[in-house]
Amino acid sequence: CEKPMAINSAEAKKMLDAAKRTGKKLTIGYQQRWRPDSLYLKEACDNGDLGDIYYGRAIALRRRAVPTWGVFLNEYEQGGGPLIDIGTHALDLTLWMMNNYKPKMVVGNVYKKLGNQERSGNAWGDWDPAQYTVEDSAFGFVTMENGATISVEASWALNIADPNEAVTYL
């Protein structure tokens, strides 16, 4: 199944129930988990080599690299912008490595600051601002039930030095 799994917990539960009922395996397209560096760090986390992990930072940022093909810019069809597209991979890795999936509180903001501009300077070509209905940046902070905290940063269009930053800090 492509990520994210569903748009709400009720739909996700239906998918899990169907998998159990039919005996089929259900997996979500979080391929970053299978990179050698991810597997190495996950093993270190599981072995306790990093101690008590109480802070994580999930980062997926691009410098003016908005995908202009497909349905990426259509909120109705895509469900959201960079948080749904690339940020979900960084957040998945962070939660997986921390082995912590129980949020207590979430706060965040989304921004559409560049999507309404005619001339974008975008690496993958210009877009029609009238068709750009998703956010171009999303930032959040998650407090987990055990007191751990996670900072989340996702953007297709920040004015940053590095053209592509995808990092998980623990």
Predicted feature locations:
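Predominantly a Rossmann-like dinucleotide-binding segment in NAD(P)-dependent oxidoreductases
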Residues: 25, 32-132
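Residues that form or flank phosphate/diphosphate-binding pockets in enzymes
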Residues: 10, 36, 161-162
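Short beta-strand scaffold segments in enzyme catalytic cores
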Residues: 140-142
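NAD(P)-dinucleotide binding in Rossmann-like oxidoreductases
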Residues: 128-135, 145-170
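Short, well-ordered turn and helix-capping elements at secondary-structure junctions
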Residues: 5, 60, 154-158
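Short, well-ordered coil/turn segments that N-cap beta-strands
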Residues: 22-25, 52-54, 136, 146-150
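Beta-strand-loop-alpha-helix segment that lines the small-molecule cofactor/substrate pocket
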Residues: 1-33, 48
